């Protein structure tokens, strides 16, 4: 599965999981390494860096921004192999 296809399906799933949320696609050309998606739900926010598989190479600065944003709120690398785990973690974080 291509990353963009995984990302499109994930966006739909997030909108179903968190009714009324806003999911934005971040511009990789603006800040290199910034996670792909930002999710705003009620008074919470999270970012997700989408990968087409667990083996896909990380690009420069991605690890840095995922770690930094995770310290601020919630941020993870997400791919088909860990999607359910990450979405469960996100749900627990957002609903707390």
Task: Pin down the residues of each PLM region.
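Catalytic phosphate/metal-binding cores of nucleic-acid and nucleotide-processing enzymes, i.e., regions
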Residues: 1-96
């Amino acid at each position: 599965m291509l990353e963009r296809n995984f990302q499109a399906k994930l966006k739909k799933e997030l909108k179903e999981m968190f009714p009324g949320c806003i999911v934005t696609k971040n511009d990789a050309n603006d800040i290199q390494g910034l996670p792909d998606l930002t999710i705003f739900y009620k008074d919470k926010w999270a970012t997700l860096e989408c990968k087409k598989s667990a083996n896909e190479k990380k690009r420069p600065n991605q690890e840095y921004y995922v770690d930094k944003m995770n310290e601020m709120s919630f941020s993870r690398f997400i791919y088909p192999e860990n999607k359910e785990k990450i979405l469960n973690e996100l749900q627990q974080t957002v609903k707390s």
